[in-house]
Amino acid sequence: MGVEEGAGVDKKITIGVCVMEKKVFSAPMGQIMDRIHAFGEFEIIHFGDKVILEDPVESWPICDCLIAFYSSGYPLEKVQAYSSLRKPFLVNELDPQYLLHDRRKVYEHLEMYGIPVPRYACVNRKVPDEDLDYFVEEEDFVEVKGERFWKPFVEKPVNGDDHSIMIYYPSSAGGGMKELFRKVGNRSSEFHPDVRRVRREGSYIYEEFMPTGGTDVKVYTVGPEYAHAEARKSPVVDGVVMRNPDGKEVRYPVLLTPAEKQMAREVCIAFRQAVCGFDLLRSEGSSYVCDVNGWSFVKNSYKYYDDAACVLRKMFLDAKAPHLSSTIPPILPWKINEPVQSNEGLTRQGSGIIGTFGQSEELRCVIAIVRHGDRTPKQKVKLKVTEEKLLNLMLKYNGGKPRAETKLKTAVQLQDLLDATRMLIPRARSGESDSDAEDLEHADKLRQVKAVLEEGGHFSGIYRKVQLKPLKWVNVPKSDGEGEEERPVEALMVLKYGGVLTHAGRKQAEELGRYFRNNMYPGEGTGLLRLHSTYRHDLKIYSSDEGRVQMSAAAFAKGLLDLEGQLTPILVSLVSKDSSMLDGLDNASSEMEAAKAQLNEIITAGSKMVHDHVSSELPWMTDGAGLPPHADEHLPELVKLAKKVTEQVRLLAQDEHENLAEPSAYDVVPPYDQAKALGKSNIDVGRIAAGLPCGSEGFLLMFARWRKLERDLYNERRERFDITQIPDVYDSCKYDLLHNSHLDLKGLDELFKVAQLLADGVIPNEYGINPQQKLKIGSKIARRLLGKILIDLRNTREEAMSVAELKNSQDQVSVSLYSSRKEDRYSQPKLFVKSDELRRPSTGENKEEDDDKETKYRLDPKYANVMTPERHVRTRLYFTSESHIHSLMNVLRYCNLDESLQGEESLVCQSALDRLCKTKELDYMSYVVLRLFENTEISLDDPKRFRIELTFSRGADLSPLEKKDEEAESLLREHTLPIMGPERLQEVGSCLTLETMEKMIRPFAMPAEDFPPPCTPAGFSGYFSKSAAVLERLVKLWPFHKNTSNGKS
């Protein structure tokens, strides 16, 4: 018989715990049930495995309320029978628990209730390996019933109890697959670089991969009015589980936005599971539910255990004894005998942070703009093709349009081109003769194309692409005989390759990340990791579209955050591409062409123009500053030495060339394999020992590289030098000096010295031959980047000021808000506001507070065992190419020369301007860093409260090799140059205020209103919104109160 609902005052409410013993005796369950029991209003009955599995339901204990949830081996149907018989109040209803075992039904149910989920599609198989006509798999996507999912995408078994989840990566990021699984030791995922094809042995859900900044959020509800959220490092990043000294996985409580709280309420109601855990993805300003787990408790949070016990108590009383008061007693029963903790003895050592932290000045923001690491020389082959096979290939991939060009990037497309080229080369060789120089050159170029396409293990679509552009057409009869149609008979083929991050570049980027971790943030390395792991470090990494830049960013992130494993998952998880901000020179192409033309005049005119109006105090103000005197006299020497090196490489390539000339069936050459975008991760000692070029460049391609440079540098027929080739000659010299010194090329040292002398003058002047021109070109190239930097700085200041205002207002509101400190501590926190308030869309007022759609994670201070939860640092890293570094530096150096800023001092001090003038090159891994500090002892309205510190590094230059000492020998063996340390751009002790920085940069930056509007939902900017309601909520949340005894402050 059921128990009457109107239980007497003296009669205790019975709570049946009908759960497998393994779950009953878990620490969180024990902590919460002990607290419920301590109220004295409840009798708790544990059924036990024997009763649940063996006894008939009629003999099971009778209870008023039932806690019952599925786990492995649990007889859910039997428990349903008991529930029908006794009709207890169910904390989690039983029928919907069947839904949780099928991911398809979970997603359908979420959609039915309007809860956002990732875009997905289901592939259902009745038998393993069943072919389905609606499922298509290609190299970089799968298509389900016409809906296409591009890599990266996620593959989940439909069985909710199968935790083997795969993520497949695009070939542009290196390809491969990461398998996620239940934690084994300290691993939660494993990367398989060679797995490209999806599974076919069962039914799967395919869903869009959501970039979340490498963080997972788990939400725990206790009834529809309470939700607690915790974040952890996503297993997608490197698969290493972060654990505390007790061996528990490290998770930190984070604040939910109002919209997310509403989602938690809806999940709880939709599945009728009062105690329910679910996974939340925060991506690009929106939130999505990607899994619902059912009964789940937070681990290792005593504050949460208190809350959960209080909420469940109210739930039980409302269901079975509504006449009894559910008001929480002023002191919780299990707290009565606890000594009050004092904060007096607390130090600030817990966060492991020293340096400026803890003094009056706090680091608030680090912004770094970084050039990519060491790369192979960039190459280009151009040839006109008339061969039918190549023209047909162009038509195959441009949709059959005779006048449309096509780009070949994917492995399949490049394999097609390689097959065609292999067939054409024997024919080309048979027609060779000394008298037919044009045919000979064409055959050589085809061989070069073939050699590039066959170069294995080093390039992918990011690094190697082919463009086919039709040039001539004829009219031919249509295949059906009716009329004529156009057909191309000649096309221009352009093959671009090279520019790959080398093993040295990867090592440099990782080491620079480590350097930043240990030196840019107070705390000697542990400070940053502590901030990051506790969600007080807001990190975003941006990269241009180029593979070498993306991989530099990923390797840097690996060093910065002390990650492990391959770069592909780190790249996809943590690096955002923004080509409009970090790629391209289109905005300044005409000005740069004009600068190059003037530069050509200056060089060919000799020393006369360079040294007109020279100021000994301001040498950088003259046209063409940095060029050597009588620069034109060095050009013949440059050509002569280039010929000498080219001839040596030709002889080295001869053997390779002869071997290729021997007849062999082209089909025995291994097929083109979609190689990894990572470049080489380690130096190939075997190749070096065998006397071969470093990397995967053979002598044939090395010769092609030098022969092209030699020909382009000087046109013998016209007797004309091309000064735009000087940087490329210097680039090749530098690469071979570092990576191919074992080939002992005679004259390479001398060639490098001449090329460096000229390049040191040419390269900076390509971005403007005088400061005014440099400023104009720089502002055009870096306009969007400068705008984003100003947004970053402004957002940081707004957040810091909001926190400061909260602290200042705390004393005024503490009397009313904390008249009873205990009442606040023991009341139900996190209760939701009305849903109509949460559903309000963002208004225009919020636009200025968040000009980008960056995902945010905020530590929840009330539940965090962290000593300084208000401490928060924003880091923004921008990885780009040489052009953007030069452009940014030029704006910082010369912004005061703009008409609108006449009379203003330069942002860069005189001594730094002098050093920069002598710094000829911003080499690989060169960087500019802006650090924003807040002096918390200065008034909020004083501009000096926020100051900027500017530093730069010239990167990994070759100067250490010039000493020819032991260090130089060691560097040559490793093929890796050290990165020069940062140099200040301001005088020591000077104060560049943020206000001044904004005034000086704003004329050259894209205005905030020109950036795309943020797609941030209501609540994301609300963490630090200045509205009265949010201020009040934050004052309640933030533990700034000196006498609080709630954990650590």
Swiss-Prot record:
Bifunctional inositol kinase that acts in concert with the IP6K kinases to synthesize the diphosphate group-containing inositol pyrophosphates diphosphoinositol pentakisphosphate, PP-InsP5, and bis-diphosphoinositol tetrakisphosphate, (PP)2-InsP4. PP-InsP5 and (PP)2-InsP4, also respectively called InsP7 and InsP8, may regulate a variety of cellular processes, including apoptosis, vesicle trafficking, cytoskeletal dynamics, and exocytosis. Phosphorylates inositol hexakisphosphate (InsP6) at position 1 to produce PP-InsP5 which is in turn phosphorylated by IP6Ks to produce (PP)2-InsP4. Residues 835-846 have a biased composition (Basic and acidic residues). Its EC number is 2.7.4.24. Belongs to the histidine acid phosphatase family. VIP1 subfamily. It is found in: Cytoplasm, Cytosol. Keywords: Acetylation, ATP-binding, Cytoplasm, Kinase, Nucleotide-binding, Phosphoprotein, Transferase. Residues 835-856 are annotated as: Disordered. It catalyses: 1D-myo-inositol hexakisphosphate + ATP = 1-diphospho-1D-myo-inositol 2,3,4,5,6-pentakisphosphate + ADP; 5-diphospho-1D-myo-inositol 1,2,3,4,6-pentakisphosphate + ATP + H(+) = 1,5-bis(diphospho)-1D-myo-inositol 2,3,4,6-tetrakisphosphate + ADP. ATP binds at residues 103, 156, 163, 182, 207-210, 216-218, 234, 279, 291-293. GO terms for cellular component: cytosol; plasma membrane; plastid. Mostly expressed at low levels in roots and reproductive tissues (e.g. flowers and siliques), and, to a lower extent, in vegetative tissues (e.g. roots, shoots, leaves and stems). Also present in mature pollen. The keyword Cytoplasm applies. GO terms for molecular function: 5-diphosphoinositol pentakisphosphate 1-kinase activity; ATP binding; diphosphoinositol pentakisphosphate kinase activity; inositol hexakisphosphate 1-kinase activity; inositol hexakisphosphate kinase activity. GO terms for biological process: inositol metabolic process; inositol phosphate biosynthetic process; positive regulation of vitamin E biosynthetic process. The modification Phosphoserine is found at residue 820. Residues 354-428 are annotated as: Polyphosphoinositide-binding domain. Disulfide bonds: none annotated. The modification N-acetylmethionine is found at residue 1. This is Inositol hexakisphosphate and diphosphoinositol-pentakisphosphate kinase VIP2. Substrate binds at residues 22-23, 182-183, 218, 232, 296-299. It is an enzyme of class 2 (transferase). PROSITE patterns: HIS_ACID_PHOSPHAT_1.
